[in-house]
Amino acid sequence: MKILIIKFRNIGDVLLVTPLLRNLKAFYPDSIIDFALNKGTESMIDENPNIDRIFLYERYDSNTNIFKKLIKEINFFRRFRHEKYDLIINLTEGDRGAIIAKLTRARLKIGYQTKSKILNKSYNLLLPLQHNRHIIESNLDPVRLLEIPIKSKSVEIFFSADDINASEEKLNGLKNF
């Protein structure tokens, strides 16, 4: 099973996807899980053992030429066209994730139902948008929809050995700690 998770949001939002990753990997232990997210938020998941590849979307500044923006968008989308994903889970309501889902030939495409009928056509399984729930619960809705048992709702972050060593050095250098 080859899976693509899409979350184009901020650092905390990306971290809150980790329960979904762990539950998917527990149910599909031999799966390949890729993650598409905004550049600058990858530190929350770059050491996560449940992720095989990370695709970074680099935002452009508002002064960038419209043609350069368009080329950048097209090049980003092209990365996904020939990937043979079985499952796409888009946890973002915007158009970028919907376009990626539409371009792939995945058998299952899960995304949030929006007011846009065009965006909704990118998916064959729609999730209701429910803003009155904790984001972890919303992020776990795809596994519920697929009838995958939820083993854990805990958020987790992983650090490299270099990160741990650097932190220990800094802590050891503090007085009265």
Predicted regions and their residues:
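Catalytic machinery of carbohydrate-active enzymes
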Residues: 1-177
